[in-house]
From Swiss-Prot:
Catalytic reactions of this protein: 2''-O-acetyl-ADP-D-ribose + H2O = ADP-D-ribose + acetate + H(+); 4-O-(ADP-D-ribosyl)-L-aspartyl-[protein] + H2O = L-aspartyl-[protein] + ADP-D-ribose + H(+); 5-O-(ADP-D-ribosyl)-L-glutamyl-[protein] + H2O = L-glutamyl-[protein] + ADP-D-ribose + H(+); alpha-NAD(+) + H2O = ADP-D-ribose + nicotinamide + H(+)
Entry protein name: ADP-ribose glycohydrolase MACROD2
Disulfide linkage: none
Region (Disordered): 241-306, 324-475
Biological source species: Mus musculus (Mouse)
Length: 475
């Protein structure tokens, strides 16, 4: 069937020879017809040719913007006839040929393709390997192994199918190939549903083209069945619309080729946009600056005042503490009231003791005196109770010795300096009171035993003697 294949025995030599030939030299050795790339319209050209005249196309052609639809084409026919840089073979894992498109490519390429594939040691699912095209119009053949779905697909099947297209496009870029044709991978005997397979193929290639727009001139979707052709024709408008411009993809391409921009640099329009918020921030900072300064100064003043008050309080507390330790404490109103109460109690005790002594002495005298004399004694008692010890009446009745004793005794009884002296004075008087009573009683008894016939003068002297004994005891 392919008589020229009998002459080719060593695949390495044949590969080197064919790869060194020009396109014209290779065409002389084609055994079959071929379809050149120039005869295949891009998707954009095909869509514009429908419903528009040639004149309109020529007028609008200079105004057209570049889009991804210029990079893709839809072709229905035999993939082995395409004169492109590479065609993709939907191979099996052994890469030794099989049914469907794989068998067609091996038969058209000749025995050298099989010989080279034997040295590749097979291929994994989702991966791809490249060989020479040999007797094919295509310069290279890229072999990829698709997933075996058999009518039921899952996430791993979709991922493997997408990897088939990505791996093939990677080899295209690495070998500097400008055109490539893809068949429908895994849709034949492998049982991958046609429409999901078309969606994965179109989406994966569009994503790659957006990043590698300048790396290829044409990617061809080659279908053989009517079902696949209708599906692709419908989906092509969705993935590659004619009005879609590629300005964004060009910018992405430049960024990928030139590398990421430094962080410190940005495009001019971005700088102008960034300056406006900075100026507004500066103005807002300037406006809020005086207020913040004023608040800061007020806070500092308040803190200083608080610190000064604390310092004064500490000093006052220190002075109070020192005064309490080294000097006599300042009497409080409560302590003064207590001192006055103690003084009143002490004076009351003194008065009571004097009264008691007088009452005892007078009671003894009254028992011995007549009724007329009892009245005189009562009168004298009333006078002594009403008058103070320092009155003029007492000084007249008392003798000169008694007057000196009374003058000496007055400062000891009347004023008290402090609480301690008042307490001590009260205790001393309390102790002396019984002695006074005892002595007064003894003297009165001694005088009363002298006899009932004592005259009036002696009785009057007996009335005054208790005061003398009291004064002597106090001395």
């Amino acid at each position: 069937m392919y008589p020229s294949n009998k002459k080719k025995k060593v695949w390495r030599e044949e590969k080197e020879r064919l790869l060194k030939m020009t396109l014209e030299e290779r065409r002389k050795e084609y055994i079959r017809d071929y379809v050149s790339l120039s005869t295949i319209l891009s998707w954009k050209e095909e869509m514009k040719s429908k419903g528009q005249n040639d004149e309109e196309n020529t007028q609008e052609a200079p105004q057209m913007k570049k889009s991804l639809s210029e990079k893709v084409s839809l072709y229905r026919g035999d993939i082995t006839l395409l004169e492109v840089d590479a065609i993709v073979n939907a191979a099996n894992a052994s890469l030794l040929g099989g049914g469907g498109v794989d068998g067609c490519i091996h038969r058209a390429a000749g025995p050298c393709l099989l010989a080279e594939c034997r040295n590749l040691n097979g291929c994994e699912t989702g991966h791809a390997k490249i060989t020479c095209g040999y007797d094919l119009p295509a310069k290279y053949v890229i072999h990829t192994v698709g997933p075996i779905a058999r009518g039921h697909i899952n996430g791993s099947h979709k991922e493997d199918l997408a990897n088939c297209y990505q791996s093939s496009l990677k080899l295209v870029k690495e070998n500097n190939l400008r055109s490539v044709a893809f068949p429908c991978i895994s849709t034949g005997i492998y049982g991958f549903p046609n429409e999901p397979a078309a969606v994965i193929a179109l989406g994966t290639i569009k994503e790659w083209l957006a990043k590698n727009h300048q790396e290829v001139d044409r990617i061809i979707f080659c279908v053989f069945l009517e079902v696949d052709f209708k599906i692709y024709k419908k989906k092509m408008n969705e993935f590659f619309p004619v009005d879609d411009n590629n300005e964004g993809t060009d910018a992405d391409m430049k960024e990928d080729s030139e590398g990421p921009e430094p962080k410190g640099l940005s495009p001019p329009h971005k700088k102008s946009k960034a300056k406006k918020p900075e100026s507004s921030k500066d103005s807002s900072e300037d406006e809020s600056g005086p207020e913040e300064k004023q608040t800061a100064e007020e806070m500092e003043g308040q803190s200083q005042e608080a610190g000064g008050l604390r310092f004064l309080l500490r000093n006052l507390l220190g002075l109070i503490h020192r005064d309490g330790v080294n000097t006599t404490p300042v009497p409080s109103p409560a302590s003064e009231d207590k001192a006055e109460v103690h003084k009143d109690e002490d004076s009351a005790k003194d008065d009571n003791t004097v009264k008691d002594s007088d009452m005892t002495n007078h009671s003894v005298c009254d028992q011995e005196l007549p009724n007329g004399q009892e009245n005189d004694s009562a009168k004298s008692e009333g006078k002594t109770e009403a008058e103070s010890p320092s009155s003029s009446m007492e000084t007249e009745d008392l003798s000169p010795n008694q007057e000196d004793a009374a003058i000496v005794e007055q400062p000891e009884v009347i004023p008290l300096i402090d609480d301690q002296e008042a307490q001590e004075g009260g205790e001393a008087q309390g102790k002396d009171a019984p002695a006074v009573f005892a002595e007064s009683q003894g003297s009165s008894e001694a005088e009363n035993t002298s006899g009932p016939d004592v005259d009036m003068n002696s009785q009057v002297d007996g009335v005054n003697e208790p005061t003398e004994s009291l004064q002597e005891d106090l001395q």
